[in-house]
Amino acid sequence: MRHDPMTPSTFDLFADAEPEQLPRREQIGEQSCVLRGFALPWLDRLLPALEAILAAAPLRQMVTPGGFIMSAAMSSCGTWGWTTDRSGYRYTRNDPQTDAPWPAMPAVFLALAQAAAHEAGFADFVPDSCLINRYVPGAKMSLHQDKDEASYAAPIVSVSLGLPAMFLFGGFERSDKSQRVPLLHGDIVVWGGVDRLRYHLSLIHI
């Protein structure tokens, strides 16, 4: 499960926004879909839980194995947290900044992830890690696959909060053409099964 939030002071940007007339559920692959506005009913519980996590494990810009500073700031919660440094990409049980365990995954995170996965056709999903990415305008990751997990059996559940974004969903080779999928506050993308290793990235646009 992943979250792409802005800072708490920017959540109210969407208070008066009118979402585009997009399908409630949009299939973007054989086993991948966008669930429009799926997270919105959960926000009253989701956002305070998110703030508590970031107070315990603040966002930070990590360094890639190649020595580059990532433009997206990150944190994690759950049994495992994703991290990167000059030693490589990996999951760790402890936050490298404090050597303390990552914050426990809040019950609302678990429930939302399971509800979205079930809606997308993935029953019995039990996430043990949540990567939190904060993108600001101009920040992005390169087109990539999520390959650091011990197993690819579970789907990816990605929750978008804050500014609109363009999600690029590609094929199984970096050179494959990517779909451009607009995402709004509260949208969730789920992909797994035969689509689990498709290339993807998110871009913030305003």
Positions of predicted regions on the chain:
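Conserved metal-binding segment of the jelly-roll/cupin
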Residues: 182-198
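Conserved small/polar residues in nucleotide/adenosyl-binding loops
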Residues: 204-206
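N-terminal auxiliary "cap/dimerization" subdomain that precedes the catalytic jelly-roll/cupin core
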Residues: 2-74
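Signature of the catalytic double-stranded beta-helix
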Residues: 73-130
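Short, conserved beta-strand element in jelly-roll/cupin
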Residues: 134, 151-166
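A short beta-strand-loop-beta hairpin characteristic of the jelly-roll/cupin
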Residues: 164-183
